[in-house]
Amino acid sequence: MADLIVGIQWGDEGKGKVVDALAGEYDYVVRYQGGHNAGHTIVVDSKKIALHLLPSGILYERCKNVIGNGVVINLEQLLNESKAFGNLQGRLFISDRAHIILPYHEILDIAKEKSRQSAAIGTTGKGIGPCYGDKVSRNGVRLMDLKNLDKLREKVDSIYQHIQYVQTLYNVELPSVQSVMEHIESIAPQILPFVTDTTQLLWAAQNRGEKILCEGAQGSMLDIDHGTYPFVTSSTTIASGACSGSGLAPRDIARVIGVAKAYCTRVGNGMFPTQEDGEIGERLRQAGGEFGTTTGRARRCGWFDAVAVRYACRLNGCESLSIMKLDVLDGFERVKVCVGYEYEGKQIDYIPTDYDNVKPIYREFVGWDKTCGVRTFNALPSQAQHYIKELEKIIGVKISMVSTSPERDDMIMLG
């Protein structure tokens, strides 16, 4: 059976730390969607380790790590990231069905974003959307294509016949087919030894009774179907994406663990009802180090949105919830939680499709002094204990972990 870690907000929730805390119990850790727009940061002995494509299980020698078919891969990024961990042969497996982000995807991503002007999505400009677009239009390049570079050249040449209009439409210059192929040919020999049919690999692992942990990227509120559209990512970020992005069946998923911060953040544009633009937002940003792992952009910050978290937990079928960065709220006299919205003159406790026009209804809690570094629930200040217990009641999902600092060992396990 497989367990699943999924983000419950707009990404950057701390999924990497949760995976790191649990990965030692598993034989396989699987990334199943997204690309190098994801950024999982783990702190080991005060040293930050940032992962963009590699599964977080890479930090455990016994873990085998799988990049599934639902991931879109920048080959150069993957190669550079892998080098930092030495010889990964036998520990890293990449799906031959995963799609490749090619140089022109990044150019298209940036050009399209600029053309949107005031309606810009806030994309990372990493080529993720255009790559998924080619996948859906059945015009993409997969890892399996690296095995026959002559046929791949023909495919890239054919793709270019369909995208030449882009140069005029967006006033950009695309790299030549020759330069794209040279780029691929220089990297392919170093990537191919890791490429395999990972679906068969995972099925075989299941038959042997081995334990699998699936690791989501981004967050549920960025899901292409159920997120704050159009300000979303291009993949299925909720639990169902773990099946389509890995080859596992729905019945193979034993439990889903949601991950949320004790407050909310968002990168890029789009709806964010509890955002605080002033002193509170800046205090959360600085205390939480809220700057993107991938882009370095300052994250928008605000109070915990229990309505959004409850919605996302229901979408994912969460058995439990991990609350991260509780320590960032240390020292606040009052802590707010959004428990409902004002919408069209009424009070509601759900997320409408017209999410841009809601106003948060808050419940206030008495703040606390210090939780940083605390590792047992009873050692938390009584006000912080009350906050966690009330979140559990409001959301209706058991809270099983609470993080109290960036350090990997500062985690309260509640069973």
Curated annotation (Swiss-Prot):
> Quaternary state and partners of this protein?
Homodimer.
Superkingdom, natural source:
Bacteria
Q: Which family does it belong to?
A: Belongs to the adenylosuccinate synthetase family.
Transmembrane ranges, per UniProt, are none
The UniProt entry's GO biological process terms, in alphabetical order, are: 'de novo' AMP biosynthetic process; IMP metabolic process
Residues given in the record as IMP binding sites: D12, E13, G14, K15, N37, A38, G39, H40, T124, R138, Q218, T233, R297
Name the cofactor(s). Mg(2+)
For whether the record's keyword set contains Ligase, the answer is yes
Matching entries from Pfam families are given as: Adenylsucc_synt (PF00709)
Residues forming the catalytic site:
D12 (proton acceptor), H40 (proton donor)
The entry marks the following residues as binding Mg(2+), namely D12, G39
According to its UniProt entry, the function of this protein is described as: Plays an important role in the de novo pathway of purine nucleotide biosynthesis. Catalyzes the first committed step in the biosynthesis of AMP from IMP.
| A cellular component term, taken from the record's GO annotations | cytoplasm
Q: Where in the cell is it found?
A: Cytoplasm
Give the cofactor binding note: Binds 1 Mg(2+) ion per subunit.
Signal sequence, start to end: none
Enzymatic class: ligase
Query: Which reactions does this protein catalyse?
Result: IMP + L-aspartate + GTP = N(6)-(1,2-dicarboxyethyl)-AMP + GDP + phosphate + 2 H(+)
Name this polypeptide is given? Adenylosuccinate synthetase
This protein's pathway: Purine metabolism; AMP biosynthesis via de novo pathway; AMP from IMP: step 1/2
What EC number(s) does the entry state? 6.3.4.4
What intrachain disulfides are recorded?
none
- Species of the source: Helicobacter hepaticus (strain ATCC 51449 / 3B1)
